[in-house]
Amino acid sequence: MNLTQEDEQRLALLRERAAAWDHKNALGEFESNAELDVYNEGIAYPPSIDEMEVGEGRPTLDKILESSIGSDSLPNLEDGPPDQEAAYHEGEMYSTMMTSYMDQDNENMDLSAGPTCSTPQPITGIHHKETINGRVTQMVYIGETSDMALINRLQDEFDVLYNTYPNRNKQGEIVHLIVMWSTPLKPSTRYSLSPAQPPGKKRKIVQHSSNPEPEIVFVPEPTSSEQSLPERQIKAYLQRGIELKGKSAEVPNFKITNETLGFSDANLKLLYPDTSLYPDNPVFILEDVFASTRQLNKIKVNYQLYDPVLPSI
């Protein structure tokens, strides 16, 4: 039997309605006979339950309920239906609580009082504004993280935004957003990436003090007394959290540790261990960025050590 376009549309509507009521047997019968039960409204409806021939093996509502008796997923209705009034007041109380929570001022909001989830969410906020090389920059603090790949992706997006649809502050100045973060080992210290450099030059990590004026960070040159200290004391001196930045330098008895980099153990996959100097306490070297003379008491630290794009091994 050839169906007209109108009949095909009605059949499609019938399929949707039949699927909604889960009348698969009825739908199969309609398609095989190519018959449409069209009412006065011109819409095809599935037949009533009395008109349908349901197979013996087809699950019915009674069978479903019988198999679910005692299930923890169903409410216990032996003592009567749930108290609708109590449920209403409980929902109203929750709604009021959430509305009150969301209406709080952002600065006074207690983030620990809100809903929680298993995956920590970074709390972003404007840290401070400064002018770098004539460009107004706005630091956006994203909280504690050791994921340099995430930081680079965010900064790349901010750079694209600045070059395509730049933001303007209340004074009408074009603002370049800069990612700012802290590390789990140094939660009170703020870091940011230097703005996009000309071709051939790489970004550096900038450390900020709480002022938050930028702080000069450099590789310290040990004094003569420090150079003569026993190896263990020199090692402790280096593990206080010295940040490495600036031009390359040769420092006696110097080894780069995870603490001096300010990263957590989550970033060890980006480094490889070296036990040549301290077999019982391996240090981690940046591959392809760290240049070593492989001499016992002299390690050459390349300024590219602070390039945020760390190699993956």
UniProtKB/Swiss-Prot annotation:
Chief site of localization: virion
UniProt KW keywords: Chaperone, Host cytoplasm, Phosphoprotein, Viral RNA replication, Viral transcription, Virion
Carries keyword Chaperone?
yes
Where are the annotated segments for Disordered? 189-208
Its BP terms in the Gene Ontology are: viral transcription
PTMs per UniProt: Phosphorylated by host kinases. Phosphorylation play an important role in facilitating trimerization and possibly P-L complex formation.
Q: Which domain of life is it from?
A: Viruses
Q: Where in the cell?
A: Virion; Host cytoplasm
Assembly and binders: Homotrimer. This trimer is stabilized by binding to the L protein. Binds N(0), and N in ribonucleocapsid.
Q: What does this protein do?
A: Essential component of the RNA polymerase transcription and replication complex. Binds the viral ribonucleocapsid and positions the L polymerase on the template. May act as a chaperone for newly synthesized free N protein, so-called N(0). Plays a role in virion assembly.
Please state what the protein is called: Phosphoprotein
Lineage runs: Viruses, Riboviria, Orthornavirae, Negarnaviricota, Haploviricotina
